[in-house]
């Protein structure tokens, strides 16, 4: 009976996902709409979310109230066309290839007659897979012979590409339009040596990419992506992981999770599928993704040898790279730093090697007693990646899986090797970022950032958390969010989210949202701490709305308007609760902000009476004297009328 129930539940989940993705409409957030800022070259239109705010009541009478308008607030938006009702969405067709013209105009790529990966050729010839296939497959593009088509290569030639101008506009989020002094106010941050400018220019973007301090992940076979940038001098980014396994999920569910992730703020998405139909799932995901897609190619290579790590070969892995490059994957996690001599260093760990990719390569090294073929063939991998503009995400295969193992010899030995490989990739003008831990207690986190900056020459750092304690299964989005905020403040450029299901199971749609909101909080907190220009505008706008009891604006400015509204309405569901000058926590008589407003009004009254309210002590004393005088007058009145509670009507 239980098996039947399980099957029914999985069918229902898949059916719900199908219903969602096949009936998508551009659904904006409440009181929000898409605005597009135009660039100077090649039809650049950068989408942002603009939140319309209600007016502030500033006085007047009940009959003639006086209001002051609040200017709209622009926020960074990762959702692409999925929140724009003006776009016709059809996942069977995929998204518009708006970068295609930019790629073609450079003249350094060519269209191939057909796919060149042997594995893809076999899949295409299998008619049994026709019902799963993405129908409208694009033509494959590759760099012409002898051409390097990476954004780093262009940057080092002094070329500002449309993609670079796009991200400059995107990072600034229309801040020049902000006129309110209150919204622009910001605390001075501590950036720990970062070089964050007041305003991001296309030239600054070019220079950061040329120096290797930032990456712009955009495979030429993924023209549907909206360009974004990862680097310590830019806004902190967040990655969401999706992916099926041999026991869970379907193509429909993974596409749903990708779309859902971009709605809730995923700057990139990693497809970590390990089950059946990896190739077909990835095609659907890439064709419908407005954000860069990353993968761990060794996972699929392992599937091709039936899960036997010892049977992996360079030839199988190389074909997997080409297969995924031709599909449009934007960055590859490559565990090239797991060297044979480092594996014994993990023997005394509490949790050993916890990285899937790391454990696969460690097993291969020990079985053959040879050096990691990802390391020995690293320059061959560079040659492939620069033909498609794919970024290296150098994997931390020896990351600590428990706080007991944090910052040990194995972890930092691998990190030093990743630094060497970074410089080798840069010789080929291939973009690189570095993956980091893991499980690290708070007092040991900064050492990770310092070591990474030292050995990897400021290449962007990308960490999974880190988790700051191991005692909270089911709440590891919180244990890791703490560490994520901290390491991002120190300079980590992108955070890989952790969901409540970490260590327990594959996340569902709601887990994805929970993890993303947690990590958007961590990323934003780090931007504030670094003093990133404009980071505080959203906080200021929400605080102003909160003080003025503009409840709808409070909900809509927040990261999760749905939950904020839901929590408020649990106790004050009526529409009158949305204009009330209190919430259910304090009630009408004890609301600190309501009392603060009354104090402000009282200060205005004092000014009108010629009393300086700047002297707080005098103000409080005067108010107390006024209150005491009024109370005494009422007491005298009560006594004069006979000290009776009730009186007969006259």
Swiss-Prot record:
Keyword flag 4Fe-4S: yes
List of residues binding Zn(2+): 439, 503
EC number in record: 4.1.99.17
Residue positions binding [4Fe-4S] cluster: 583, 586, 591
Pathway named in the protein's UniProt entry: Cofactor biosynthesis; thiamine diphosphate biosynthesis
GO CC, one annotated term: cytosol
Record's keyword terms, sorted: 4Fe-4S, Iron, Iron-sulfur, Lyase, Metal-binding, S-adenosyl-L-methionine, Thiamine biosynthesis, Zinc
Cofactor(s) essential for the protein: [4Fe-4S] cluster
Pfam name, any one: ThiC-associated
Any GO molecular function: carbon-carbon lyase activity
Gene3D superfamilies for the chain: 6.10.250.620, Radical SAM ThiC family, central domain
Cofactor: how bound: Binds 1 [4Fe-4S] cluster per subunit. The cluster is coordinated with 3 cysteines and an exchangeable S-adenosyl-L-methionine.
Described function: Catalyzes the synthesis of the hydroxymethylpyrimidine phosphate (HMP-P) moiety of thiamine from aminoimidazole ribotide (AIR) in a radical S-adenosyl-L-methionine (SAM)-dependent reaction.
Family membership noted in the UniProt record: Belongs to the ThiC family.
NCBIfam families per UniProt: PRK09284.1, PRK13352.1, thiC
Known partners and oligomeric status: Homodimer.
PANTHER family on file: PHOSPHOMETHYLPYRIMIDINE SYNTHASE, CHLOROPLASTIC (PTHR30557:SF1), THIAMINE BIOSYNTHESIS PROTEIN THIC (PTHR30557)
Stated name of the protein: Phosphomethylpyrimidine synthase
Protein species of origin: Pseudoalteromonas translucida (strain TAC 125)
Name of the coding gene: thiC
